[in-house]
Every structure is written in C-alpha cells, then in structure tokens.
C-alpha cells in the first residue's frame, strides 16, 4: 500500500497518513524518537527510498524517525492487514509442517483433492489470494490441530 501524503497534527498529537483508500492516524507516542513539546517536528515527508510505503520525520533537534505503512495499519487494526498477517503466519507454519511431514507432497496434494499448482500457491507466502479455509484444510491434512482463540483485548 502506497502513502499519498503525510502531515502532522500537533493538536491531535498524531501523524495523518493518507493512502488511496483512507486516512489513518498514528499517535506520536507510537513512534521513536517521540516528538515532544520542546522538540517538535521540523518536517515530515513520504519517503521515496521506501517506495512510498513509509514516511520520515525530522525533529527540531535533528533526530530522524522512519515509519513503515505496516506500523500504521497494525496500530489502526486495518482488517485487510490483519487478514494478510494471519494468512502469512499460517503459511509459514504450513511450510514448516510440510517439510517436517513424513507424507510425500503428492500424497498431501491427493488428500487435499487439489492440483499441484494450487498446493504450491498455498505454500507461497506472497500469494494473498488464498483463503484461511484452504490453509486450515492443508494443516488438517498434515495432522495439525489449529485452535482459534478469541479473547478480550487488553488495555
């Protein structure tokens, strides 16, 4: 996700990060070095060195800080980002389990009832078009119990 613009709002004590879909807020308290009243932000800009996927801010003292868009999305609990993070974690676990499994890959593919191409897409962590359901099926074939725990958010 690319950042279109970034600004700082001292009244809200937060950065305002605008993407193509919406605007996100990131409080100063979530970045390091943290801007303070006596050491405010001199300038903030979308960083082209990060492929416009992050921004850099410079404090009046000369210290710099860089923030990636993933930090902003994680703080704002963006549903798309959280889904992709869950898929990534499940994919990495599936890759480890496939390597450690005594089953041949052809047998795993047969038990999944899918093609070899689809199987390798499931194991590709860059592929975000797969579903959690498909990964859970793969983990089940690999004799894994997956427990989904839902709990109240801690303060």
Task: Show the residue positions of the predicted features.
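Motif-centric detector for short Cys/His coordination patterns
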Residues: 1-112, 116, 129, 133, ...
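Short beta-strands and strand-loop turn motifs
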Residues: 118-120
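DNA major-groove recognition helix of helix-turn-helix
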Residues: 123, 134
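Catalytic-site neighborhood detector that most strongly recognizes the C-terminal catalytic loop/helix
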Residues: 126
